[in-house]
Amino acid sequence: MNTPLYKALIQHARRNSHSFHVPGHHNGDVFFDDAKSIFDPLLTIDVTELAGLDDLHHPSGVIKEAQELASQLYGSAESFFLVNGTTVGNLAMILSVCEPGDTILVQRNCHKSVFHAVDLSGAEPVYLAPDVDSAMHVPTHVPLGTIKEALEAYPDAKGLVLTNPTYYGHSADLTEIITEAHHYGIPVLVDEAHGAHFILGEPFPVSALKMGADIVVQSAHKTLPAMTMGSYLHLNSSCRINRDRVAEYLNRLQSSSPSYPIMASLDIARAYVQHIIEEQKLSDILQRIETLKQTFDSLTNAEAVNPANPLIITDPLKLTIRSKRGHSGYTLQSILERANIFTELADENQVLLVLPLGGKRRINAEIIRSIDEEIEKTPPDQTFVSAEWGVQPVTVLPYPKKVLHSFKKEYVSFEEAAGRLNAEDIIPYPPGIPMIMAGERITKESVQKLSRLISMKTHVQGNMKIKEKQLLVYIEEEKS
């Protein structure tokens, strides 16, 4: 296993050195005894920028070597380790291409970090509505026709931001879209958080990096054996991206005390993927994935659901199941949790499971029987099919950001909110996609959906008054 950073950390730990440096646990010497047995092995490599351990913000040794190995594996011009998750990668890539007042094209069902980056940049977003799959009732990809319409209307846009795959593992062929954007000289920035394993090839979807995207950010911690917050940012060889600006923003936005355990896990995750490829382990892993899927397929009161659109490729690591007995996804998720099966997310209709890329996890027949019995005896609750994701394929906010920020705000009841201008992001989490964004006009349908989600006890990020059925709205000039 060629893991230069991890190896250097282990070598340092074996020296049994005397720590007179941060962090304050001093190699685990200062720690609660009750927790020490759990944390102890990790604390020995939770160090700082010591001799031989390099510096993430100016790599010249083992971190540089580890990043270069990741770049070689993924075929990028350069790869960066991220210790603040794909969130920091999304922030850096968008800030690197935008200035205040610039136009940027953004897929509407992106993660909240994308919209936060746009807001911080001062750019004016143009939102691109995705298709909604008729079988799963979730947003998928932005169709080529919508992309072309946006490019023709905004040929001077500074970037096109896409999410591929979606949280549900739905991936589209972006080749034509990327080619079209490049025809206008517009860089394509892709949040590929759920696709760090796509480098393994079929039957997994193709990575946006291979399809020619200019910057791709991946959450290694989502599908690879990396610690939470460990991600990669990949730069393609491109004249459309200023590499130094990307690096500068990563230096500004990432912690000045990056976690060595997280960085080491990124080194190990890359080596794990490389091992699968070099040792031809993929067929065995796929068989284990299929066995797990067959286990859930044996449920008589639930079923797997897949997109109706034949152009959508579903990641084999994602499994979406739905009750056959009229339960919402939230109720089905609770039933699974009572059987000690904890899933990634639920929505109004279904539950999403993220399957492991390897491992030995098995679910026995007794657990499946208990789940079936629970589904059968749990009273059904009405399921709601999501409406379309927007009336127009290409939209802009009613007011520029500068004008919005000049408006005062007030709280109004849900009943009064329709037609008003929303003043904060309303985000069901997970998946972290804003349902209503600050600056968007609130519709009657969105208020109704938010009411349903709250009644289902869905976790919604926003101010605490949402639970009291109040929304923060802007006071527009004509209403002040």
Curated annotation (Swiss-Prot):
Q: Does Lyase show up as a keyword for this record?
A: yes
Q: Return the InterPro entries for the record.
A: Orn/Lys/Arg_deCO2ase_major_dom (IPR000310), Orn_Lys_Arg_decarboxylase-I (IPR052357), Prn/Lys/Arg_de-COase_C (IPR008286), Prn/Lys/Arg_de-COase_C_sf (IPR036633), PyrdxlP-dep_Trfase (IPR015424), PyrdxlP-dep_Trfase_major (IPR015421)
Swiss-Prot/TrEMBL keywords: Decarboxylase, Lyase, Pyridoxal phosphate
Q: What is this protein called?
A: Uncharacterized protein YaaO
SUPFAM superfamilies referenced in this protein's UniProt entry, alphabetically: Ornithine decarboxylase C-terminal domain, PLP-dependent transferases
Family annotation (Gene3D superfamilies):
Molybdopterin biosynthesis moea protein, domain 2, Type I PLP-dependent aspartate aminotransferase-like (Major domain)
Could you tell me which residues carry N6-(pyridoxal phosphate)lysine? K222
Q: What Pfam families does the record point to?
A: OKR_DC_1, OKR_DC_1_C
| CC cofactor | pyridoxal 5'-phosphate
Q: PANTHER family, per this entry?
A: ARGININE DECARBOXYLASE, DECARBOXYLASE, PUTATIVE-RELATED
Tell me which CDD domains the record gives.
Orn_deC_like (cd00615)
Family classification: Belongs to the Orn/Lys/Arg decarboxylase class-I family.
Coiled-coil region(s): none
Which molecular function term from Gene Ontology is one that the record holds?
Answer: carboxy-lyase activity
